[in-house]
UniProtKB/Swiss-Prot annotation:
Natural source organism: Arabidopsis thaliana (Mouse-ear cress)
Catalytic reaction equation(s): L-seryl-[protein] + ATP = O-phospho-L-seryl-[protein] + ADP + H(+); L-threonyl-[protein] + ATP = O-phospho-L-threonyl-[protein] + ADP + H(+); L-tyrosyl-[protein] + ATP = O-phospho-L-tyrosyl-[protein] + ADP + H(+)
UniProt GO MF annotations: ATP binding; protein kinase activity; protein serine kinase activity; protein serine/threonine kinase activity; protein serine/threonine/tyrosine kinase activity; protein tyrosine kinase activity
Domain (Protein kinase) ranges: 98-423
SMART domains: S_TKc
Sequence positions that bind ATP: 104-112, 127
EC number in record: 2.7.12.1
Name listed for the protein in its UniProt record: Serine/threonine-protein kinase AFC2
Domain of life where this protein originates: Eukaryota
UniProt similarity note: Belongs to the protein kinase superfamily. CMGC Ser/Thr protein kinase family. Lammer subfamily.
Pfam families: Pkinase
GO BP: mRNA processing; protein autophosphorylation
PANTHER family, per the entry: SERINE/THREONINE-PROTEIN KINASE DOA-RELATED, SERINE_THREONINE-PROTEIN KINASE AFC2
Length: 427
């Protein structure tokens, strides 16, 4: 029986062509005959009996191939669910190398499982992508991007580190270092309480440093959001938070991460910079105005997302909570002021309905009274930040205004933002 190729790094080439997946030794159904000898490539061979050598792959080859016999004890073959998600049980083996311990999360792409790596003797996070063509293709793009980032991020301090990847039962599986919770999950479990300003400063600097690093490599992440920023450690401390007047204060406690170290994840939507990119990118709350208006986008769309994230860390809530384009644009004007007329004159034909007589068609274009209320309740950016920040508010407001400039050509770059006085206190 021919076994499939399992990949370890470094890679010298990636073939994106679709192919029929060879059946794995651990995919054999219970009634099958004894495991047969076959070719097995990569470091998974450490879990194959009759292994000839324990040497690691050389730098000159993408994998190491030896003959081996697959072990028994693989989980029974299960059909995927109707959406193409992999069906598993805790304690299952995911290839002979990885043992499933828990489910860490899920999304439209698939699931993330906490697994024990028998070879490295450590816990890892394994992203199991849905067995659907478009998600498999996106996973291969993510792997390529992770490889490129890994080549240049020698210290591994900016982006999540990929350990391995393989194709198992029609699911692309990407093995990552195990990190802590996402910023979103931390906020949610903390009842959406804001972060202290010094922590916002540290996280903001790291995030901008990662974005600047990617932009230097001509990469655009396109999906920056709190869900895609992980704390390296989930450890936290509780600090008192005082509410009410000085005479009668109620004390409650909120969680604060012990460490400010973060890493960016999810590079499935990452693309290289090129002309005329007009398709929709980014998750709604963090989507830049040029994307909504069909004006084309580039590096500045990431910078806009960072600005929204920094405000959210200061307040505990997403800045623009909407799911409709015109309402979203109206919220932007409410918080940041009117759009430049030259931007509104250039909108594409799909976005013309949002503009009337050179201005945003609001409030006339509002679809409901609730929509009007949602926009009117938003304060100006300065007032919003000052409600939550005691010191450094002026510097923070100035920097965020630069990150959230409507015109992408006038928006500050990530590298410029790193030199802003707001970050002087950390240097």
């Amino acid at each position: 029986m021919e076994m499939e190729r399992v990949h370890e790094f470094p890679h010298t080439h990636m073939d994106r062509r679709p192919r029929k997946r060879a059946r794995l030794g651990w995919d054999v159904l219970p009634q099958a005959t004894k495991a047969q000898v076959g070719m097995f490539c990569g470091q998974e061979i450490g879990n194959i009996s009759s292994f000839a050598s324990s040497g690691a792959p050389s730098d000159n080859s993408s994998s190491l191939c030896v003959k081996g016999v697959a072990r028994n004890g693989s989980p029974p073959w299960r059909e995927d669910d109707k959406d193409g998600h992999y069906i598993f049980e805790l304690g299952d083996d995911l290839t002979p190398r990885y043992k499933i311990y828990s489910k860490m999360g899920e999304g439209t792409f698939g699931q993330v499982l906490e697994c024990w790596d028998r070879e490295r003797k450590e816990m890892v996070a394994v992203k199991i992508v849905r067995g659907v063509k478009k998600y498999r293709e996106a996973a291969m793009i993510e792997i390529e991007m992770l490889q490129q980032l890994g080549k240049h991020d020698k210290g591994g301090n900016r982006c999540v580190q990929i350990r391995n990847w393989f194709d198992y039962r029609n699911h692309i599986c990407i093995v990552f270092e195990k990190l802590g919770s996402s910023l979103y999950d931390f906020l949610r479990k903390n009842n959406y309480r804001s972060f202290p300003i010094d922590l916002v400063r540290e996280i903001g600097w790291q995030l901008l440093e990662c974005v600047a690093f990617m932009h230097d490599l001509r990469m655009i992440h396109t999906d920056l959001k709190p869900e895609n920023i992980l704390l390296v450690s989930s450890d936290y401390v509780k600090i008192p938070e005082y509410k009410g007047s000085r005479l009668q204060r109620d004390v409650c406690y909120k969680r604060v991460p012990k460490s400010s170290a973060i890493k960016v994840i999810d590079f499935g939507s990452t693309t290289y910079e090129r002309q005329d990119q007009t398709y929709i990118v980014s998750t709604r709350h963090y989507r830049a105005p040029e994307v909504i208006l069909g004006l084309g986008w580039s590096y500045p769309c990431d910078v806009w997302s960072v600005g929204c994230i920094i405000v959210e860390l200061c307040t505990g809530e997403a800045l623009f909570q909407t799911h409709e384009n015109l309402e979203h644009l109206a919220m932007m004007e409410r918080v940041l002021g009117p759009f430049p007329q030259q931007m509104l004159k250039k909108v594409d034909r799909h976005s013309e309905k949002y503009v009337r007589r050179g201005r945003l068609d609001w409030p006339d274009g509002a679809t409901s009274r609730d929509s009007l209320k949602a926009v009117l309740k938003l304060p100006r950016l300065q007032n919003l930040i000052m409600q939550h920040v005691d010191h450094s508010a002026g510097e923070l407001i100035n920097m965020v205004q630069g990150l959230l400039r409507f015109d992408p050509s006038e928006r500050i770059t990530a590298r410029e933002a790193l030199r802003h006085p707001f970050f002087a206190r950390r240097r």
